[in-house]
Amino acid sequence: MPRSFLVKKIKADGFQCSGVSAPTYHPLETAYVLPGTRGPPGDNGYVAHCLPPSGYDGEQKPGLELAPAEPAYPAAASEEYSDPESPQSSLSARYFRGEAAVTDSYSMDAFFISDGRSRRRRAGAGGDAAGAGDAGGGGGGGGGGERAGRSGATAGGGHRHACAECGKTYATSSNLSRHKQTHRSLDSQLARKCPTCGKAYVSMPALAMHVLTHNLRHKCGVCGKAFSRPWLLQGHMRSHTGEKPFGCAHCGKAFADRSNLRAHMQTHSAFKHYRCRQCDKSFALKSYLHKHCEAACVKAAEPPPSAGPAS
């Protein structure tokens, strides 16, 4: 007998080892989307996002049913994450539940994670301030004690910067140094001169404002007067239009310039420090006192002209 009859023929389209059963393929009834995977481009040039059903036409046997992929994060309730800084805010929770689309807009605060340290720091600062307020307020209310503690730290605790020449005090050292410039002599080395006109200044802010007066770029179209700043020109234009947008809340008097309104508001103040020596009348502004002295008191103090003898 030839040796070829002793060898078992094996089909060319399959392979089977002894003791190992051949794998059975079953068609997928539905297409399952695998997150993060993309198939090869199709005929229309687009990438397929899902797996097509298998084309194997074999014997139908019950196979294992694939379970849908679970989300990477558990679905969060809207009330569970109420912090807008949390990465799992209400928008992200709705996205994982499938209620929100990818096109939902997110603010930048949604991408910052807060670990709570800043809140604890603010809470600790509030507690320290409340404790200081209770100590300074003598057992008063929480709000009043806190305000009392803050005012005591500013006024009572009291580090004020005093000028050695005139004794005037300031809250900050920068304000004091700016004030000390006014005590300089025009002949000192610290004085500066204007590069255009040569005028000397001991205060650097005053020199900076003076330099701007040589560059009058903003000119009035009505009278031709020029100004260094646009808001100065805007206030000047009100003198041509007669507009007075700044009104007094007490008497209703209107002004074209805000600074004039501030000066007028001093007349309604209860503090009137400038007193006339002749009639004992007090004024809130020194300029008003000068006008009063030049107009009323001076004329009242002058003796009436004596009548000449009748001829």
From Swiss-Prot:
Zinc finger (C2H2-type): 161-183, 192-214, 218-240, 246-268, 274-297
The keyword Metal-binding belongs to this UniProt entry's keyword annotation: yes
Molecular-function annotations in GO: sequence-specific double-stranded DNA binding; zinc ion binding
One Gene Ontology biological process: regulation of neuron migration
Subcellular location per the Swiss-Prot or TrEMBL entry: Nucleus
Positions with biased composition (Gly residues): 124-146
Region (SNAG domain): 1-20
Classification via Pfam families: zf-C2H2, zf-C2H2_6
Family matches, as SUPFAM superfamilies: beta-beta-alpha zinc fingers
GO cellular component, one term: nucleus
Record's keyword terms, sorted: DNA-binding, Metal-binding, Nucleus, Repeat, Transcription, Transcription regulation, Zinc, Zinc-finger
Positions of the UniProt region annotated as Disordered: 71-90, 120-156
Purpose: May be involved in transcriptional regulation.
Family statement: Belongs to the snail C2H2-type zinc-finger protein family.
Name under which the protein is recorded: Transcriptional repressor scratch 2
Taxonomic lineage of the native organism: Eukaryota, Metazoa, Chordata, Craniata, Vertebrata
Name of the gene this protein is made from: Scrt2
